[in-house]
Amino acid sequence: MKRAFKWGSIIIVCGLIISGIAYLGHKQLFDPMSPIEESTANRDVLTRKSFNKIKVTASSADVIIKQGNHFTVSYYGNKNHAVHAQVKDGVLKITQTPVTHSKLAKFQLLNSSDEERCIVTVPQKASLTKIEGHVNNELLLNRILAKKINLESNNGDINVLNSEFDQGKIITTSGDITIRNSSLIQTKLASTSGDINLNKVSLTKGCSLLTSGDFNGQRLTIIGHYSVTNQSGDNSITKSTIDGAKLTTKSGDNNLKRKHRSGGSLERNTTEPNFIYLKNVSGDNIIK
């Protein structure tokens, strides 16, 4: 009886150790809608100089560019993966110490319960001429005006809230693109392995490209010609302002208002100036 109890205790202890390691190695999910806590604990203010262009490269930190009271760049997280910021000739350049594979394993075991975040604040009336961001994790822009953007994430999502861009591109390799309450002019959206989700967005020209994800649009306003091209996901648009549309798919269904067709194409008011074209290979097209 004592022997069984002893073995049972050992199994329980081992289970607790494994659970603890799994917890420490698991990074908390990034929620773009949650309030951003900016306590002074473990915070480094990198610069307070003004700028009109941003060029950021981050190997492991989430990057947040948002409206604030002043020009500020702050970093919260592990100092071994420190973020560096420099302003020269109006250009804010942000870089981060790369994380090697050996350091990454140790970091995940001991420190990954702590979030790594680089937060850039821009005053309300400031308009940026260009934002260039190349990150490995999450990227969030909130209440930002920019003439040109070039945003890319390898393994994280890109979220845009309450912002206006005149031209550019937003690209994810393995993550979603989510845009809400924003205006995009001549902007290309592309996702290799993720969804594109738009809600209350004005789209002036431009396009969306997907390989293996869904395009979800709600309450969109289409100005000029806009196209959505998908390889193996569904394209869905609801409650949107669209004058004309064309839907094509090789091995899926087309649903345009009350019209339905398997494969082939459906179209409506194709000569209208504000027009959207949904192209698909092996997925459905839906406009309600």
Describe each PLM feature range:
Residues 26-97, 113-130, 138-150, 158-159, ...:
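Short linear S-[DN]-x-LW-Φ motif typified by the pepsin-like aspartic protease active-site region
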Residues 177-288:
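Short, surface-exposed interaction patches in beta-rich subdomains
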Residues 47-49, 122-127, 144, 163, ...:
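Edge/loop elements at the starts and ends of beta-strands within beta-rich repeat scaffolds
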Residues 101-113:
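Alpha-helical membrane-targeting segments
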Residues 1-3:
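N-terminal Lys/Arg-rich, disordered targeting/topogenic segments
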Residues 130-181, 188:
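Right-handed parallel beta-helix
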Residues 6-23:
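Hydrophobic membrane-insertion alpha-helices, especially the h-region
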Residues 52, 69-71, 88-92, 147, ...:
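Beta-strand-connecting loop/turn residues
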